[in-house]
Amino acid sequence: MRGIIWGKNIERARDRFEMLIEDYAWIKIKPIRVIKSRNEFLVEFENGDKWKAIEASERKLGQRSNIALVDIEVDEDIVACIIKPANSMPPYNALSYFSL
């Protein structure tokens, strides 16, 4: 599964990214690769799941995922034009909102 955490800004996306890693730890799934830099947050887990955290903006066209975690503060135009079209990889897809 490929997932994207869409934050209103990179800081909010990063915070939810850290919480996601903790959530996986609760179910005993370990990260095998984690990349954290100024503008990039990627994690790959031992079960094959891959997640990245990015800022939701018009510049993020072309992203693809099965599941999207969207900051509740992201503008609805961005959700409709950027995030929903990006969330279309088969065999399944889901979109969920989060708040910090």
Where are these regions (language model features)?
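Short, flexible loop motifs at catalytic/binding sites
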Residues: 1-100
